[in-house]
Every structure is written in C-alpha cells, then in structure tokens.
C-alpha cells in the first residue's frame, strides 16, 4: 500500500506502480471521484462526523482517523463507535508504542499507524 495520497496525480502514479491499497489523510469530492474510479481499495482520512457521513454516502465503511491526537483520541473513537456502529477506523497521528494497545482494544479500530514503527 501507499500512504498520504492527496492528489489525482498521486492516485494515477499509485495505480501505475501496482499498489494494492491507498491511504489519504483527508477527502474531498475530487479525490473521492478519483479514488472511486481507480479500482484500488483505499482508506480516506476523516476527523469529524460530517466527513464520516459524507464517506458513508459514498458507500465507504473504513476510514483513517487523522490526526487522532488533535481530534479527541480514544474518547472520539468511542463516541463514533456508538454513533456509527458499522464504521471501522485506523487512527494515526499521535499514536505511540505506549498508547497503541488502548486504541486496538476498541471494537471499531482495525489497525493503527505510528512513526514509532519505522
């Protein structure tokens, strides 16, 4: 997979090198259209309920929650789990070796990302 995809140009480059999935820190209408037509699975970034709802309207059910440390950390994800029970998240941004297990313990978290892994 490839991360921090933020433009149609990057989506095309990712497609040309044969990636299996893409991750973006955010989403807008232009990127949504490009992701949807690329044929490559992707995880769009969200931070707010409005962004989650817009993604759900696209038929998406898995999102990157970014930056987690600035948008409510575990509290936000717990609340989103109650409001959006069918939605899954991969939180990134401020996740550490010390905190990642707390995130992974949540039912709506399928993975985490963090720079400590590098």
Residue ranges and their predicted role:
Residues 1-6, 11, 18-27, 41-48, ...:
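Catalytic beta/alpha-barrel core
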Residues 25-31, 64-74, 108-118:
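Glycine-rich phosphate-binding active-site loops on the catalytic face of alpha/beta enzymes
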Residues 34-35:
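A generic structural signal for well-ordered alpha-helical segments
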Residues 70-71, 86, 95-98, 118:
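Short Gly/Pro-enriched loop/turn and capping motifs at secondary-structure junctions
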Residues 87-88, 108:
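A short pocket-lining beta-strand/turn micro-motif at the edge of beta-sheets
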